[in-house]
From Swiss-Prot:
PROSITE patterns: IMP_1
Keyword tags: Abscisic acid signaling pathway, Calcium, Hydrolase, Lithium, Magnesium, Metal-binding, Multifunctional enzyme
Cofactor: Mg(2+)
Function, as annotated: Phosphatase that converts adenosine 3'-phosphate 5'-phosphosulfate (PAPS) to adenosine 5'-phosphosulfate (APS) and 3'(2')-phosphoadenosine 5'-phosphate (PAP) to AMP. May regulate the flux of sulfur in the sulfur-activation pathway by converting PAPS to APS. May play a role in the biosynthesis of sulfate conjugates and RNA processing. Is also able to hydrolyze inositol 1,4-bisphosphate and inositol 1,3,4-trisphosphate. Could be considered as a negative regulator of abscisic acid (ABA)- and stress-responsive genes, through modulating the inositol 1,4,5-trisphosphate (IP3) turnover.
Family: Belongs to the inositol monophosphatase superfamily.
Residue numbers binding adenosine 3',5'-bisphosphate: T139, H235, S259, K262, R276, D288
Annotated binding of Mg(2+) 2, by residue: D134, D137, D288
EC number annotated for this UniProt entry: 3.1.3.7, 3.1.3.57
Amino-acid positions noted as binding Mg(2+) 1 in the UniProt annotation, renumbered to this chain: E71, D134, I136
Inhibition and activation profile: Inhibited non-competitively by Li(+) (IC(50)=0.20 mM) and Na(+) (IC(50)=200 mM).
Protein name, UniProt field: 3'(2'),5'-bisphosphate nucleotidase 1
UniProt keyword Metal-binding, yes or no: yes
Binding site for AMP: H235, S259, K262, R276, D288
Length: 353
């Protein structure tokens, strides 16, 4: 398999970060939640997850130049009054890494932790290799006890070549009730991974179980398709998604879940369509889609903007998008693009009146 060494490191990093997140989610304390300037909640686990991934990748791939594009920086943790939070994160990270032989006996200081978090301040771009991380994708889902993901991808010369999604709360069985992935298991926690040209695989997050190759839904009739969208109305225009679904003839109600767990569920055929149309003025960040995009495309799906253009991850931290992001299989995509085009045109016409 291509990128075998990088994939092993990424799976280890994402799995350990997910273990840290699970520990925090189980005992979520009010003091864990801080407020960032953009009003989205950020947690102790967010910082801890980023530190774990940064430290594991650096150690496992020590012979290579290391560039990480990630969501968090340590600015808030360096402010007065943050010492208790910083020490708590440092302890969590140390406890998590102590389970790994390669880190046994090495204890991080708070300064080590801040440095690890700030390794994620790369800008990305079209040249070289860049790891791309969302340490907790779906922070609001995490805080509610719902879906979230540790999402880690690798860009090489601006192209996505590897992606790992650790989804601690995603059942092994289908979340759409169709049970296409043929699991009757009630086990929870999935790890999805893909490398370019090698397909997408899923396995239980907390076990050495054998990975299973997965495929997107083969549904050709939109009436039989189910579609995913963001749980939070603040993240996506649900009215526009509803209009598109109506034009397609989709009969099933939308499945609304947080985070790139949607991409994982789509890759194994739980749903057939994903619609994401952010509110005007919102700029999509690459860490919200890099890992998920390759997980779906390697499983046979197509990921584009609303005009049908492939997503371009080579422009730095932000995606330069036409309106939104849509995902479907090869058969449904032409029908979906037409429904999207017609619905957007109607919406623009209505707003001009």
């Amino acid at each position: 398999m291509a990128y075998e060494k990088e994939l092993d490191a990424a799976k280890k990093a994402a799995s350990l970060a997910a273990r840290l997140c699970q520990k925090v989610q189980k005992a979520l304390l009010q003091s864990d939640v801080q407020s960032k300037s953009d009003k989205s909640p950020v947690t102790v686990a967010d910082y801890g997850s980023q530190a774990v991934v940064s430290l594991v990748l650096e150690k496992e791939l020590s012979s290579e130049p290391f560039s990480l594009v990630a969501e968090e920086d340590s600015g808030d943790l360096r402010k007065d009054g943050s010492q208790d939070t910083l020490e708590r994160i440092t302890k969590l990270v140390n406890d998590t890494l102590a389970t790994e032989e390669s880190f046994n006996g090495s204890t991080l200081s708070t300064d080590d932790l801040l440095r690890a978090i700030d390794c994620g301040t790369s800008e990305g771009g079209p040249n070289g290799r860049h790891w791309v991380l969302d340490p907790i994708d779906g922070t609001k889902g995490f805080l509610r006890g719902d879906q979230y993901a540790v999402a880690l991808g690798l860009l090489e010369e601006g192209k996505v070549v590897l992606g790992v999604l650790a989804c601690p709360n995603l059942p092994l069985a289908s979340i759409a009730g169709n049970n296409k992935n043929k699991s009757s298991s009630d086990e929870i926690g999935c790890l999805f991974f893909a490398t370019i040209g090698s397909g997408t695989y899923m396995q239980l997050l907390d076990s050495k179980s054998s990975p299973v190759k997965v495929q997107v839904s083969s549904v050709e009739n939109p009436e039989e398709a189910s579609f995913f969208e963001s749980f939070e109305g603040a993240h996506s225009l649900h009215d526009l998604s509803s209009s598109i679904a109506n034009k397609l003839g989709v009969k099933a109600p939308p499945v609304r879940i947080d985070s790139q767990a949607k991409y994982g569920a789509l890759s194994r055929g739980d749903g057939a369509i994903y619609l994401r149309f952010p509110h005007k003025g919102y700029r999509e960040k690459i860490w919200d889609h890099v890992a998920g995009a390759i997980v779906v495309t390697e499983a046979g799906g197509i990921v584009t903007d609303a005009a049908g253009k492939p997503l371009d991850f080579s422009k730095g931290k932000y995606l330069d998008l036409d309106t939104g992001i849509i995902v479907a299989n090869e058969k449904l995509m032409p029908l979906l693009l037409k429904a999207v085009r017609d619905s957007i045109a109607e919406q623009e016409k209505a707003s001009a009146l």
